[in-house]
Amino acid sequence: LIPAILIMLTSLGISFVRPIFVLFVETLDINKNYLPTITGALYSIVGVFSVFSAYWWGKKVESFGLQKSIVVASILTATMYLLHAFITNPYYLIPVRTFLGFGYGALMPLLFTRISNNVNKDRRGGVLGIGSSFQVMGNLVGPLLGGYAGAAIGFSYSFFFTAAIFLLIAIAGYASLRD
């Protein structure tokens, strides 16, 4: 159950800032005519590096360990969200979003691997289905909470809160997920 909850928290954290990200980028010093293009590119950076990092993490997990990989990826993701709160120049978002993608690309595959490794083959499909349901729940709740938080407490605090979610994942991953 703990890996499924961590999957939900990861999805929640990933989707938490989606409703406010365009508004956040708009506050930076950019040409407003290019706002959709710039925001789309900044989202794409995360996606591209997630794809490449998933492969890299998959190779490294054998030597590094599953628990340690989850903790490191969560801390990396938390750190990148924390940096978002202090960014005033849109060009600084490029490396931050790159490393954010590197952390993202690890978390979901690692958490699903954790579930898969600890369940009998005859129960694996059902348990992975539960994990997927928790992922969907996080994707549904995250934008709702994120939009509310962005309006209520502001963009910077929303990034702090998201960083705290990923630190919680790191702590829970360290405390409860043993290799």
Q: Which sequence ranges carry the predicted segments?
A:
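Short amphipathic helix-loop junctions that connect adjacent transmembrane helices
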Residues: P19-T37
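Intracellular juxtamembrane helix-capping segments at the cytosolic ends
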Residues: A106-V119
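Pair of pore-lining "gating" transmembrane helices in MFS-fold secondary transporters
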Residues: L1-V17, T98-F99
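Structural signature of the two symmetry-related core transmembrane helices
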Residues: K68-L83
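Helix-to-loop junctions at the C-terminal end of transmembrane segments
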Residues: F52-L66, G150
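A membrane-interface helix-boundary motif in multi-pass transporters
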Residues: Y148-F166
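Interfacial helix-cap and linker-helix signal at transmembrane-aqueous boundaries
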Residues: V25-E26, K60-V61, Y148-G154
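Paired small-residue
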Residues: M80, Y91-F99
